[in-house]
Amino acid sequence: MIKIPPKAKILLIKLRSIGDVVYNTAVYTPLKESFPNASLTVLVERPSYDLVCDHPDIDEVLCFEKGSLWSQIQFYSRLIRAKYDVVIDMHEGTRGAVMCFLTLAPIRIGHKFAKRSFLYNAKVEFSDLEPKFPIDYQVALIKKIGVK
């Protein structure tokens, strides 16, 4: 288990599928209950924004939109300037892993099995999860920081 500061700035990255973002909402409340003084930011793509924007446990929602090179540079620059303490990549794709890395957060959590796992400094092994439902993977990631 990784110890994080009580007032940590936490970023959850979940891009792509709306259905996967729905699964991901199940981790917001346990995170806030475990770290009530933490700031929780969720990063999603535009189609999923409305699913999470009014969630009571989220302090901020960032919306990634593919656009011009300049707009992407501005977006990544914003991620770096935010100075997150903990970033959890719940996406499983290259873009989420790169975003996680570019935050320069001291704690970057992601999937151990991914070829891009070198971008994380805390990795979660999923081979022992039974059954392997999407929510099991999400929960395993937040357990890494002590969420029960």
Cite the ranges covered by each PLM segment:
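Catalytic machinery of carbohydrate-active enzymes
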Residues: M1-K148
